[in-house]
Regions:
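Extracellular-loop-to-transmembrane junctions of the mid-late helices
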Residues: 2-14, 114-153, 193-205
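Hydrophobic alpha-helical transmembrane segments of multi-pass membrane proteins
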Residues: 8-28, 38-63, 75-83, 108-118, ...
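Membrane-water interface of transmembrane alpha-helices
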Residues: 18-25, 81, 143-159
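Membrane-interface helix-boundary motifs at transmembrane edges
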Residues: 27-42, 65-67, 90-103, 126-129, ...
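Membrane-embedded alpha-helical segments of multi-pass membrane proteins
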Residues: 73-84, 139, 207-210
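The cytoplasmic-loop to transmembrane-helix boundary for the fourth helix
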Residues: 90-120, 131-140, 165-183
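Interfacial "cap-and-anchor" motif at the non-cytosolic start of specific transmembrane alpha-helices
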Residues: 169, 175-237
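Membrane-proximal linker segments that couple transmembrane helices to downstream signaling/catalytic modules
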Residues: 218-265
Length: 265
């Protein structure tokens, strides 16, 4: 067995274990939070998608046949998988109008990667798509950077909001937020370069796996530390933001209503 096969097999087992841990931890949650549970299943789906990708790589010998083919398959699966994990985090951090915006942008970037791959295949007439691979890499990097920036912004806003609204200890939440952002930054810095070279993938792959395991354990810890008070804060915050969003769409909300009342008077 060569090193590449062992790495891919280890990644396959690792992703399945992480997915099972997330599913089994559902049994130990004291208080259910709908947004957290939604995020849990999104991340579980992402881990199973990654596991399927490693299984396909092993069965088909895709990475072994060429770094470019391995990179193409990686980007076709990594992009939606990473988007699901990022949205799982973002779903906990922000409110409905902003979540919708992230879904649209992530979908557009994923579609751009798949279209680029299809155009490259038609243009070259083979699976070796040449310089179109770097166009795919550009869209992949843009997707990762976008997810990191959006999550970072929402974490800062939510931290300030919770400090104003909550008198209880929010250290578990802050710990989860920091770890999630660090892991996303790690993926943003490492993966676009690692997937182009099998040697780099073998060196950096175990580091990314350890980071993902830490993320999984921290995410599970967040779920077990949820209390009803935090759920109420989430609902109240979402209600306030949704109300402001509706007022903005109605043309200024309270200020327009004040102007109308003075006009009528």
């Amino acid at each position: 067995m060569n090193t590449l096969y062992l790495l891919q097999f280890g990644c396959l087992i690792f992703m399945v274990i992480n997915a099972v841990l997330l599913v089994m931890s559902r049994l130990y949650v004291k208080w259910e939070n709908k947004r957290y549970e939604h995020s849990r299943w999104l991340i579980v789906i992402a881990f199973f998608m990654l596991a399927f990708q490693y299984l396909a790589q092993i069965q088909g010998g895709i990475r072994a046949s060429g770094d470019d083919l391995g990179a193409i398959v990686n980007m076709l699966i990594y992009t939606p998988s990473f988007a699901l994990i990022a949205y799982g985090i973002y779903n906990i951090e922000t409110t409905q109008p902003r979540r919708r915006h992230m879904v649209i942008v992530s979908t557009v970037l994923c579609t751009a990667i798949y279209l680029t791959c299809a155009i490259g295949y038609l243009h070259s007439g083979s699976q070796h798509i040449g310089w179109w691979l770097y166009v795919m890499l550009l869209f992949y990097a843009a997707s990762v950077v976008y997810d990191v920036v959006m999550i970072s912004r929402e974490m800062k806003k939510r931290k300030k909001m919770l400090e104003r609204m909550a008198a209880n200890d929010i250290q578990p939440y802050l710990r989860y937020s920091r770890v999630s952002l660090i892991l996303l930054c790690l993926a943003a810095l490492v993966m676009p370069f690692a997937i182009l070279s099998t040697t780099l993938l073998i060196i950096l792959g175990p580091m990314v796996l350890c980071a993902l395991l830490f993320f999984t354990l921290t995410f599970i810890s967040l779920g077990t530390n949820y209390v009803p008070t935090e759920s109420l804060l989430d609902d109240e915050a979402e209600r306030i933001v949704a109300q402001r969003y509706a007022e903005t769409r109605n043309g200024g909300g309270i200020f327009c209503n004040l102007f109308r009342s003075r006009t009528v008077g």
